Amino acid sequence: MSSSLPPSSCDCFVSLPPASLSSFVLFGKNSDRPRDEVQEIVYYPAASHPLGSKVKCTFIEVEQVRETLAVVLSRPAWLWGAEMGANEMGVCIGNEAVWTKEPVTEGEALLGMDLVRLALERGPSAQKAVQVITELLGEYGQGGSCREEPEPFIYHNTFLLCDRSEAYVLETAGPYWAAERIVEGARNLSNQLSISVCPWSEHPQLRSHALQQGWWDGQGEFNFSVVYSLEKQPERMAAAKLRYRAGQELLRMQEGHMTVKSMQSILRDKESGICMDSGGFRTTSSMVSVLPRSPHEPCIHLLSATPDPSRSVYKPFMFSPRVTQVPWVLSPTFGEQDPVNQIPRFQTQVDRRHELYRQHQRALEACKGNKEAEETLRQKQLKVEEENLHWVDTFLDTSKSADPVGGSDIFRICVEKELALYKETGEK
């Protein structure tokens, strides 16, 4: 039996001009997952693949394409896909769990997180990425356990996708889906269907299926979120509605003034539950992206790589010809002995903590119970982050004439600086 207990939260945000202070598009996401799950930051360069080859995703294989784009991913270390990420063309995607009237199935298929990675690798624009996901959804379906436990935990997915000029919300219920296009203003997602009437695009049988199931009479206005949402929502899904409204209000308060810092402050908001830690779940990783309108200006992606953004540091990553994987945010691998590769799956646990995660955890433990030490560590973290953001601001101001290789080492440098801080704290 699959678990029907949804996680407490997951929140995605996008801000386009005129909601953004500058001409940039801003993307943000908190990944809220089982509290002990580790997320790693993984970089994959662009690649060419043999005709007719396949790619092994978390549970199943799919047909590979000839060319894949370079991607940076924030992902639970046990799976193939990603909770959120970006590609070299400036496309950002985040996914969220959703439960609808369409039942989940027990069989293994593509995880929503697999679809995130596949769309980033294959989608040079947000619109193309929507097409990639819907085509794969139709061919392979979605399903499979989404956490490292023997009891399956299965859900369907919603996605927020954006690029330098526009954004899309893609919401699914089994194989069925609806999409909304956003060209200005701000939008958020919080573990629920939110597309109402007149979707930008939809599954060709979306309405006829609802009619056959008796969810819609075919006469009144077709409202996707009303027709496909569960009539009796679990308690935690009711909490998602409150978070959704809180997210809308936080976006409204920043309307016309949204910056990287204000997006970070939204993702760090504890009162709303957007930055959460309850019921066995917490924010395990966080991401903010800055997407300039001009294709000649590089996009910058800020990643935490550690749990709880209110006690973490955002570090800038930029695609460039010389960028390489940073080992200290990469989890160990276990090959065929990995519990995800054993049948039955997830009968044992392994330690997936990467070096930054370990040192972050150690520093927090060293300060635990000592308010002065906790505040000192937080102020040092904020100072490091302020230096990181100063680099971002400076680079964006000068990037029109800058060589993109100038940012190839910035993520590595920032991770090393953060590691040094935690090691110093943990040794005291």
Swiss-Prot record:
Gene Ontology biological process terms, A to Z: proteolysis
Gene3D superfamilies linked to this entry: Penicillin V Acylase, Chain A
GO MF term list: cysteine-type exopeptidase activity; dipeptidase activity
InterPro entries xrefs: Peptidase_C69
UniProt cross-references to Pfam families, sorted A to Z: Peptidase_C69
Active-site residues per Swiss-Prot or TrEMBL entry: C10
Positions of transmembrane segments: none
Source superkingdom: Eukaryota
Annotated family: Belongs to the peptidase C69 family. Secernin subfamily.
Name by which UniProt lists this protein: Secernin-2
Protein's organism: Xenopus laevis
Primary gene name: scrn2
